[in-house]
Amino acid sequence: MTKHGKRIRGILKNYDFSKSYSLREAIDILKQCPPVRFDQTVDVSIKLGIDPKKSDQQIRGAVFLPNGTGKTLRILVFASGNKVKEAVEAGADFMGSDDLVEKIKSGWLEFDVAVATPDMMREVGKLGKVLGPRNLMPTPKTGTVTTDVAKAISELRKGKIEFKADRAGVCNVGVGKLSFESSQIKENIEALSSALIKAKPPAAKGQYLVSFTISSTMGPGISIDTRELMAS
């Protein structure tokens, strides 16, 4: 049997595809999967009971993961004047104004998150078709459009992440690394689920957390019992 086949067989020993697990059980299953040569990202995919086509049922926000993401972010700041210096001193990786806008228009996207000062949004808004689908567009709702550039950068470095429901009403979010302690992964997921529950639109009816799946980069997608998350 090939190495790939052996890996799949090893995963299936610990996992029943037809079952929903507690959060702790699911994390343990991911950790018991045959190892790979890199530190895998732990992702969650949450199907929400919303109609994202309606403006009053769109979900977007930000939350602090108490244990961070385990990822070194490449932070870009759209700014001019003294705010460029502030961005440099705060540790931004890329900063600029019209020059960055033009660079992104030409296809460059080597960054993970963007911050912008309000005066830059007229130009940054022209990048909507590029940044929007990639969830890279700065927005006041998540604190990435701000005059306090240093604070925004500091929060991102400390584990602040954005979440957004796509056109199918699904949020896909990285919540840490598989090398984290199980308790750290669990705490991060609970922080995210709590933020999502608080962000429930008043117009959304019926079951809100329709499904909740946790996976690692090379591991299976494991269904979580949503009742645990609603109660936490």
Swiss-Prot record:
Keywords: Repressor, Ribonucleoprotein, Ribosomal protein, RNA-binding, rRNA-binding, Translation regulation, tRNA-binding
Gene3D superfamilies with a match to the protein in the record: 3.30.190.20, 3.40.50.790
Keyword Lyase: no
Taxonomic superkingdom: Bacteria
Single biological process term from Gene Ontology: translation
UniProt KW Cell membrane keyword: no
SUPFAM superfamilies to which the protein is assigned, alphabetical: Ribosomal protein L1 (SSF56808)
InterPro entries: Ribosom_uL1_bac-type, Ribosomal_uL1, Ribosomal_uL1-like, Ribosomal_uL1/biogenesis, Ribosomal_uL1_3-a/b-sand, Ribosomal_uL1_CS
Alphabetical list of PROSITE patterns matching this protein: RIBOSOMAL_L1 (PS01199)
Pfam families: Ribosomal_L1
Entry's transmembrane regions: none
GO CC annotation, single: large ribosomal subunit
Annotated function: Binds directly to 23S rRNA. The L1 stalk is quite mobile in the ribosome, and is involved in E site tRNA release.
Subunit relationships: Part of the 50S ribosomal subunit.
PANTHER family, sorted: 54S RIBOSOMAL PROTEIN L1, MITOCHONDRIAL, LARGE RIBOSOMAL SUBUNIT PROTEIN UL1M
Family: Belongs to the universal ribosomal protein uL1 family.
Family matches, as NCBIfam families: rplA_bact (TIGR01169)
Name of this chain's protein: Large ribosomal subunit protein uL1
